[in-house]
Amino acid sequence: MSIDQARLEIHPEVKETLVKGGAVVALESTIISHGLPSPRNVVVAAQIEQNVRDGGAIPATIAIIGGVVKVGLSQAELEILGDPASDVVKVSTRDLGPVLAAGRNGATTVS
Protein backbone atom coordinates (compact mmCIF):
# COMPACT_ATOMS: atom_id res chain seq x y z
CA MET A 1 0.00 0.00 0.00
CA SER A 2 1.31 3.47 -0.84
CA ILE A 3 0.12 6.84 0.35
CA ASP A 4 0.11 10.22 -1.34
CA GLN A 5 2.80 12.28 0.43
CA ALA A 6 0.34 15.20 0.65
CA ARG A 7 -1.70 13.00 2.99
CA LEU A 8 1.20 12.12 5.29
CA GLU A 9 2.97 14.49 7.69
CA ILE A 10 5.78 13.31 9.91
CA HIS A 11 6.45 15.71 12.77
CA PRO A 12 9.90 17.33 12.33
CA GLU A 13 11.13 15.99 15.70
CA VAL A 14 10.10 12.45 14.75
CA LYS A 15 11.66 12.75 11.30
CA GLU A 16 14.94 14.12 12.69
CA THR A 17 15.14 11.36 15.29
CA LEU A 18 14.53 8.67 12.67
CA VAL A 19 17.20 10.12 10.37
CA LYS A 20 19.69 10.08 13.25
CA GLY A 21 18.77 6.49 14.13
CA GLY A 22 17.24 7.45 17.46
CA ALA A 23 14.42 5.76 19.31
CA VAL A 24 10.83 6.59 18.36
CA VAL A 25 7.78 5.06 20.04
CA ALA A 26 4.55 4.92 18.01
CA LEU A 27 1.42 5.54 20.08
CA GLU A 28 -2.19 4.95 19.08
CA SER A 29 -4.56 7.86 19.62
CA THR A 30 -7.88 6.26 20.53
CA ILE A 31 -7.14 6.74 24.23
CA ILE A 32 -7.53 10.46 23.54
CA SER A 33 -10.73 10.40 21.49
CA HIS A 34 -12.53 7.33 22.77
CA GLY A 35 -10.76 6.04 25.88
CA LEU A 36 -11.01 8.82 28.43
CA PRO A 37 -13.33 11.76 29.07
CA SER A 38 -12.34 15.33 28.23
CA PRO A 39 -10.24 17.12 29.49
CA ARG A 40 -8.50 14.23 31.24
CA ASN A 41 -7.85 12.57 27.86
CA VAL A 42 -5.45 15.27 26.65
CA VAL A 43 -3.70 15.45 30.03
CA VAL A 44 -3.11 11.68 30.07
CA ALA A 45 -1.89 11.73 26.45
CA ALA A 46 0.65 14.42 27.35
CA GLN A 47 1.76 12.39 30.39
CA ILE A 48 2.23 9.27 28.25
CA GLU A 49 4.28 11.24 25.73
CA GLN A 50 6.40 12.64 28.58
CA ASN A 51 6.95 9.12 29.93
CA VAL A 52 8.27 8.10 26.51
CA ARG A 53 10.62 11.11 26.54
CA ASP A 54 11.76 10.28 30.07
CA GLY A 55 12.66 6.82 28.77
CA GLY A 56 14.94 8.33 26.12
CA ALA A 57 12.69 8.08 23.06
CA ILE A 58 10.56 10.45 21.03
CA PRO A 59 6.79 9.86 21.07
CA ALA A 60 4.98 9.60 17.74
CA THR A 61 1.26 9.64 18.45
CA ILE A 62 -0.48 8.70 15.20
CA ALA A 63 -3.81 10.15 14.06
CA ILE A 64 -5.63 11.54 11.06
CA ILE A 65 -6.34 15.26 11.20
CA GLY A 66 -8.43 16.74 8.40
CA GLY A 67 -7.73 13.78 6.12
CA VAL A 68 -3.96 13.86 6.68
CA VAL A 69 -2.10 11.07 8.48
CA LYS A 70 0.00 12.66 11.22
CA VAL A 71 2.94 10.82 12.78
CA GLY A 72 3.71 12.86 15.88
CA LEU A 73 1.19 15.45 17.00
CA SER A 74 1.31 19.03 18.17
CA GLN A 75 -0.48 20.08 21.35
CA ALA A 76 -3.21 21.66 19.20
CA GLU A 77 -3.71 18.37 17.33
CA LEU A 78 -3.93 16.43 20.61
CA GLU A 79 -6.62 18.88 21.69
CA ILE A 80 -8.57 18.36 18.45
CA LEU A 81 -8.64 14.63 19.17
CA GLY A 82 -9.70 15.29 22.75
CA ASP A 83 -12.55 17.64 21.87
CA PRO A 84 -15.88 15.78 21.81
CA ALA A 85 -17.13 18.27 19.19
CA SER A 86 -14.38 17.24 16.73
CA ASP A 87 -16.30 14.16 15.54
CA VAL A 88 -13.27 11.87 15.61
CA VAL A 89 -13.68 8.43 14.02
CA LYS A 90 -12.00 5.35 15.51
CA VAL A 91 -9.73 4.12 12.69
CA SER A 92 -8.15 0.75 12.00
CA THR A 93 -6.56 -0.30 8.70
CA ARG A 94 -9.91 -1.00 7.05
CA ASP A 95 -11.10 2.56 7.78
CA LEU A 96 -8.08 4.49 6.47
CA GLY A 97 -9.30 5.00 2.91
CA PRO A 98 -12.77 6.33 3.71
CA VAL A 99 -11.54 8.62 6.50
CA LEU A 100 -8.73 10.04 4.36
CA ALA A 101 -10.99 10.49 1.33
CA ALA A 102 -13.62 12.29 3.41
CA GLY A 103 -11.04 14.60 5.00
CA ARG A 104 -12.13 13.58 8.49
CA ASN A 105 -10.39 13.33 11.84
CA GLY A 106 -9.50 9.84 12.98
CA ALA A 107 -7.90 8.24 16.01
CA THR A 108 -5.79 5.17 15.37
CA THR A 109 -6.13 1.83 17.11
CA VAL A 110 -4.10 -1.35 16.96
CA SER A 111 -7.21 -3.55 16.86
Predicted regions and their residues:
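A generic secondary-structure signal marking the coil-to-beta-strand transition
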Residues: 21-23, 58
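Glycine-rich anion/phosphate-binding loop at the beta-strand->alpha-helix junction
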Residues: 98-111
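Glycine-rich nucleotide/cofactor/substrate-binding loop typically near the N-terminus or early
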Residues: 29, 34-36, 42-99
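Conserved phosphate/anionic-ligand binding catalytic regions in large, soluble enzymes, centered on
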Residues: 23-37, 109-111
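N- or domain-start disorder-to-order transition segments that initiate the globular core
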Residues: 1-21
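Short, charged beta->alpha transition segments
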Residues: 11-14, 84-85, 110-111
